[in-house]
């Protein structure tokens, strides 16, 4: 204890009393900041599909758009052991979102029951054509209740190799592209970790448990973009994840594509969704892995009423977002509904993800110190930094949990609110991370 006594004495001597009982360092003065959070923050909020007819009307109150993408659209073949790509289709998708000042939530998939986008035939897989032409590649077919569906052949070694290599190449090209906010990954129908309605044959129409572990471990190593898998991956029949501590330690997030349906919660009856969140989320996954999804389509009622301020099925959106620490949520069919005004979209978006608050800001003209609180419901999952007139803090806001705070020091003076901003290499130049600051008094 003696070795700490002298620094403590110096610290005590460097403080002077304030009327409110707090202390401010000698030579430092409080900086009166006035700043408000007025809109949805980048990489958070309600999400619309890129093809939505009202995407321009709602553009100012959302930050994200969703798009399924097809590997077969960007892969042209393989030569000399390397996959050949033409990314022009995908670049067009990203640039289209960017034109509306939005980032993408991207999901690559192989199977989509009944969908005709690949070649006009219902249910065709999005497996690259060069693989489909291999003699030892044989897809299976099922007239699934969700639509006719062809299934990728997971006995094929080339498909297994390609699926891993694709994300290696994707990461090399797009890891630091600010047009992409999040990735959703998976296998089966819509990449949602199931093939409900079709008999499961692990290693044939769905990847084996061993390959799933190999794949998930690989993407965790190569991807810097925050990525999520379906809560359906909690099912140990389909996946090995919840019974494998190495897999549970990976930095994946979760998406729930039937969020807020009538029996979502255990207390509401079935509770399948909540149980999945508990089993694969363990109440802490959201600390490092982004959480999102899509409002339920179990009935047409759900999407059109979840924004009711009086609540739906006993829950308001704000309560559900806080409970599950939601950062983004697809709400395509809420637009134009009685509860889905642009203002309500803005309110709901602000109620998701991170929100920062600055308190105790003081400066001596050469150095500025303040505390930042996260007053949102989730952390920010990519690096972001405070800066003053171009001088940047060395402390990232990434991972700052709700209710927690960081002390920030920037080696330059501050005279007004406009000089203090938040920057990130992972948002578009047209986007801005706001913060709340309405007090020039020291607070706890």
Per-range role (PLM):
Residues 321-372:
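Long, well-ordered mid-to-C-terminal structural blocks that present hydrophobic/aromatic surfaces
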Residues 24-158, 284-322, 326-340:
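N-terminal substrate-binding region of glycoside hydrolase catalytic domains
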Residues 137-159, 163-203:
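Active-site groove signature of glycoside hydrolases
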Residues 350-444:
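Extracellular/luminal regions of secreted and cell-surface proteins that mediate adhesion/ECM remodeling
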Residues 65, 97, 170, 183, ...:
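Conserved, mostly hydrophobic/aromatic
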Residues 27-52, 98, 182-192, 196-335:
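Catalytic-core regions of glycoside hydrolase
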Residues 1-3, 8-10, 15-29:
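Bacterial Sec-dependent N-terminal signal peptides
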Residues 89, 93, 162-166, 170, ...:
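Alpha-helical packing segments of well-folded alpha/beta enzyme cores
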């Amino acid at each position: 204890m003696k070795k700490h006594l002298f620094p403590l004495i110096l610290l005590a001597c460097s403080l002077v009393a304030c009327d409110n009982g707090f202390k401010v360092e000698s030579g430092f003065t409080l900086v009166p900041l006035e700043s408000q959070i007025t809109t949805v923050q980048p990489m958070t909020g309600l999400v619309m599909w890129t093809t939505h007819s009202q995407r321009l009307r709602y553009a100012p109150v959302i930050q994200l758009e969703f798009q399924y993408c097809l590997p077969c659209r960007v892969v042209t073949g393989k030569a000399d052991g390397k996959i050949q790509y033409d990314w022009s289709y995908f670049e067009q998708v990203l640039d289209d979102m960017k034109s509306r000042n939005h980032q993408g939530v991207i999901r690559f998939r192989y199977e989509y029951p009944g969908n005709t986008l690949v070649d006009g035939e219902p249910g065709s897989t999005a497996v690259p054509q060069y693989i489909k032409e291999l003699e030892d590649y044989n897809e299976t077919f099922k007239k699934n209740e969700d639509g006719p569906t062809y299934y990728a052949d997971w006995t094929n070694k080339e498909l297994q190799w390609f699926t891993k290599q694709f994300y290696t190449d994707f990461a090399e090209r797009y890891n630091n592209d600010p047009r992409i906010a999040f990735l959703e990954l998976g296998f089966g129908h819509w990449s949602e970790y199931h093939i409900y309605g079709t008999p499961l044959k692990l290693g044939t129409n769905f990847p084996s448990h061993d390959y799933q572990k190999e794949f998930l471990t690989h993407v965790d190593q190569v991807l810097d973009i925050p990525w999520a898998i379906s809560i359906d991956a909690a099912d140990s029949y389909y996946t090995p994840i919840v019974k494998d501590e190495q897999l549970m330690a990976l930095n994946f997030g979760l998406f729930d594509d039937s969020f807020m349906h009538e029996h979502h919660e255990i207390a509401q009856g079935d509770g399948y969704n909540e149980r999945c969140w508990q089993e694969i989320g363990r109440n802490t996954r959201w600390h490092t892995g982004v959480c999102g999804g899509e409002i339920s389509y179990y009935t047409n009622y759900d999407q059109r009423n979840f924004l009711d301020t009086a609540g739906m099925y006993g829950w308001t959106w704000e309560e559900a977002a806080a409970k599950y620490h939601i950062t983004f949520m697809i709400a395509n069919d809420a637009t134009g509904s009685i509860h889905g005004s642009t203002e309500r979209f803005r309110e709901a978006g602000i109620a998701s993800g991170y929100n920062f608050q600055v308190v105790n800001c003081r400066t001596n003209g050469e150095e500025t110190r303040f505390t930042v609180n996260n007053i949102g419901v989730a952390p920010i999952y990519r690096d972001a930094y405070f800066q003053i007139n171009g001088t940047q803090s060395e402390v990232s806001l990434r991972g700052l949990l709700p209710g927690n705070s960081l002390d920030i020091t920037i080696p330059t003076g501050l005279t007004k609110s406009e000089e203090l901003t938040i920057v990130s290499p992972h948002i578009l130049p047209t986007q801005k991370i706001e913060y709340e600051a309405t007090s020039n008094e020291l607070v706890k």
